[in-house]
């Protein structure tokens, strides 16, 4: 567990597709017209989305980026010739909280004064890589999720603001004992439960100390399992929301997935709700690839968590 004394969220910028903009988020910074964003390929569209976020945030001392493309290809291209130190994280959908932990360590140790976490995913890119190309027309199962299209950049520094990152726990890799890549919520549910228990133990806190537990992309299926596991342990959170489960309106599948679900819902739905003063962000990740699934391996999962506290009268 890592404790932070002076790590604050100062600004954020997002670029989303119309599907996310028409969902349960409010006032994203920029909405693209279609999946191609006036580019020839969707890969280049995602690169452009990342670039738009970076262009609308202060120049950082370091960038930590994560996405779902092979070898972090989209952020690698975005960072070309910027002359900014760059750290790529490839931890599936668990990366947002992990990026905040990494930046928090650097800022608190005075290695840097500030940095940006840039998270992105693109529905057409991820579906092609992990499932089937959209053109194939494969039907969506009710337990399945679909990747959100979004890039979101978050600028952190040691300059005080209303939102403080106070601590974080890096998760352990657990075996889900499931082989179904369409049931990522089921794959990740126990991981979310285990990391939450570890975090409560490490911080010597109770589940009732938190106004909200926000998980990343368990979806409706995984969120139900997660709460059942907590209840079996005698734990009843004040409030639990899964970002993937609520991101879209009238969604017939289990919801949205991808590393952007958590920050998108947090910054554009949750953060201005005055009921929530102390929030746990659990970034959930299914650590599979096509080879693993084709070879019928059970899918590992990991969850990373950070605590965000709202500082009243911080001025």
Can you say where each PLM-predicted feature lies in the sequence?
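Phosphate/pyrophosphate-binding betaalpha-module
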Residues: 142-151, 155
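Conserved "HGTGT" condensation-loop signature of ketosynthase/thiolase-family condensing enzymes
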Residues: 1-87, 152-315
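A generic, well-ordered mixed alpha/beta core segment in the N-terminal half of proteins
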Residues: 77-79, 85-144
